[in-house]
């Protein structure tokens, strides 16, 4: 094995792309900040029992576990920042009984690649709101998600909506047990309409519920899906409430192309209600995902309404605007000591100054000039 080789699906980010990522990260955090979202930086590693909440069993498959040499306890390297932020809201920011708006941008590590582009070290960025159950909170986060996609230069973005509350309301009304609900949810996620129909038939569900479950995978399309669903799904208050929330989101974004899919349930297990995602050209999957996950903080002692979104900033590298390196001022090595004061003054002004040792360098070919002493004064002389 070569000493320079990296693990599979792990990659370095070289200067050109690193500049793109850091520029986009700075712009995103600035965007979040002017919308009232405070930056938090959870640790890369925590005790495993804190990272692996019982709510999302699938997270354990993504999480790399190690033994802490100090305590002997099991540690986990985070695979998702959202549970960490829920812990912060529930425990460290518990003095605030009102709304907490929080954001983050940091690396996570996956035990296995999670879809394309097959990277195991995403740079997860996102924003979350805790303490507000109203649909207006979800609309605020969706608006912020769409603005984030503009910074990432995604071009025209399709907003996709779903609501897991509809499926769960039907499951409860049909008296499905946890195992049946999970099995049917998996079939819904696979869009396997035939298997859904066969499964509800095998369970001998009441005709109304069997028809409703078979109908869900067919309820997709534009905004008209909502009126169609109202006329064809059982008249349950929870179903009606979920459709009202979806309608409110559609009304809030009249100029956006919207796709609604009532069987789109590809969510982390902690999501509880409205689901939203952004799709862009040339990407095989959603470029950002979010939704409501009320109660996740209960695992850490304070269950609160919550909604938020996240995305992998590294997956956008091919679309991010180029960020040119600042032209440098060169100073000859033999002049460096004498010119130290002038060099530091330029650097304090934000100017890149590089000592030229005469053997080449990796600075931009477009130099700002060379620092020379003219008439007793150090000046930048253009080439």
Curated annotation (Swiss-Prot):
Pathway: Amino-acid biosynthesis; L-histidine biosynthesis; L-histidine from 5-phospho-alpha-D-ribose 1-diphosphate: step 1/9
Swiss-Prot/TrEMBL keywords: Amino-acid biosynthesis, Cytoplasm, Histidine biosynthesis
Function, in words: Required for the first step of histidine biosynthesis. May allow the feedback regulation of ATP phosphoribosyltransferase activity by histidine.
Protein name: ATP phosphoribosyltransferase regulatory subunit
Subunit and partners: Heteromultimer composed of HisG and HisZ subunits.
InterPro entries linked: aa-tRNA-synth_II/BPL/LPL (IPR045864), HisRS-like_core (IPR041715), HisRS/HisZ (IPR004516), HisZ (IPR004517)
GO biological process terms, semicolon-separated: histidyl-tRNA aminoacylation; L-histidine biosynthetic process
The organism of origin for this protein: Neisseria gonorrhoeae (strain ATCC 700825 / FA 1090)
């Amino acid at each position: 094995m070569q000493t320079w080789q990296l693990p599979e699906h792990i990659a370095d980010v070289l200067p050109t792309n690193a500049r793109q990522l850091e520029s986009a990260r700075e712009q995103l955090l600035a965007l979040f900040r002017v919308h009232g979202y405070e930056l938090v930086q959870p640790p890369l590693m925590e005790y495993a029992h804190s990272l692996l909440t019982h709510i999302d069993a699938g997270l354990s498959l993504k999480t790399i576990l190690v033994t802490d040499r100090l305590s002997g306890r099991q540690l986990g390297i985070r695979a998702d920042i959202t549970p960490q932020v829920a812990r912060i809201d529930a425990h460290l920011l518990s003095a605030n009984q009102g709304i907490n708006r929080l954001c983050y941008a940091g690396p996570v590590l996956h035990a296995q690649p999670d879809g394309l582009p097959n990277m195991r070290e995403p740079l997860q960025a996102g924003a979350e709101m805790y303490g507000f159950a109203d649909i207006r909170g979800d609309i605020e986060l969706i608006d912020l998600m769409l603005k984030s996609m503009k910074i990432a230069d995604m071009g025209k973005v399709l907003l996709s909506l779903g609501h897991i509350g509809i499926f769960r309301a039907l499951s409860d009304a049909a008296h499905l047990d946890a195992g049946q609900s999970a099995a049917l949810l998996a079939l819904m996620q696979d869009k396997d309409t035939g298997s859904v129909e066969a499964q509800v038939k095998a369970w001998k569900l009441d005709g109304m519920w069997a028809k409703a479950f078979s109908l869900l995978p067919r309820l997709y399309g534009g905004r008209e899906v909502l009126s169609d669903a109202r006329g064809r799904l059982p008249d349950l208050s929870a179903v009606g409430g979920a459709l009202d929330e979806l309608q409110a989101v559609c009304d809030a974004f009249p100029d956006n192309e919207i796709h609604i899919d009532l069987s789109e349930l590809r969510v982390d297990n902690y999501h509880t209600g409205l689901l939203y995602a952004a799709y862009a050209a040339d990407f095989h999957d959603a470029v950002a995902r979010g939704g409501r996950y009320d109660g996740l903080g209960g695992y850490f002692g304070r269950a609160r309404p919550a909604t938020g979104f996240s995305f992998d900033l590294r997956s956008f590298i091919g679309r991010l605007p180029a960020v040119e390196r600042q032209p440098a001022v060169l100073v000859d090595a033999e002049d460096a000591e004498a010119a130290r004061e002038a060099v530091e003054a330029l650097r304090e002004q934000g100017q890149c100054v590089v000592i030229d040792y005469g053997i080449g360098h990796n600075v931009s070919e477009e130099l700002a000039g060379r620092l020379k002493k003219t008439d007793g004064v150090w000046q930048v002389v253009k080439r």
